Design a protein with these regions (language model features):
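Class I S-adenosyl-L-methionine-dependent methyltransferase catalytic core
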Residues: 2-163
């Protein structure tokens, strides 16, 4: 499924799906990580996504996790609680038709997702919760407590901090 570029689209920066456009949910619901920021983040972690198991816990459009998939991730878990956002994320994931078996989609509250998946181990974790949530440290501690992080796991964390 190909999309033309418009204000509500972002693109995959590199890898197998370089240049593929992805739909973006309404900006009142999510804050999509823009192309240049994603490029800088993935350049900083270099080949960490190669062969990795990735969790994008507040996935929104799924762009961060799908970028990791495009760069060689073995398995990508995309989760978002918001139903309308999940529908867009699923559509974006399904547009990568050759990789559907590598993408696991969930429409759960982050706490439910974590509790149901304590048996998983992740190499790359993306935490970018909705505005005003300051929960990333608690999530990381939970994942450490249940050994959900591989020894050399990388965590990308973005959140607002109160002034």
């Amino acid at each position: 499924m190909e999309y033309s570029r418009s204000y509500d689209m972002i693109r995959i920066i590199a890898g197998t799906y370089k240049g593929r456009f992805l739909k973006v949910p309404d900006s009142k619901v999510t804050r999509p990580t823009m192309d240049k920021v994603r490029q800088a983040l993935f350049n900083a972690i270099k080949d960490k996504s190669l062969g990795s198991v990735v969790l994008d816990l507040f996935a929104g459009s799924g762009a961060m996790g799908l970028e990791a998939l495009s760069r060689g991730a073995k398995q990508v878990y995309l989760n978002d609680k918001n139903r309308s956002t999940f529908v867009i994320m699923r559509e974006n994931a399904l547009s990568l038709s050759t990789e559907k078996d590598k993408i696991i989609l969930s429409n759960l509250d982050y706490r439910v997702f974590l509790k149901r998946n304590t048996d998983l181990k992740f190499d790359l974790v993306i935490l970018d919760p909705p505005y005003k949530f300051t929960i990333n440290a608690d999530i990381i501690e939970y994942m450490k407590k249940f050994s959900m992080l591989n020894d050399d796991a990388v965590i990308i964390s973005e959140q607002d901090y109160p002034n």
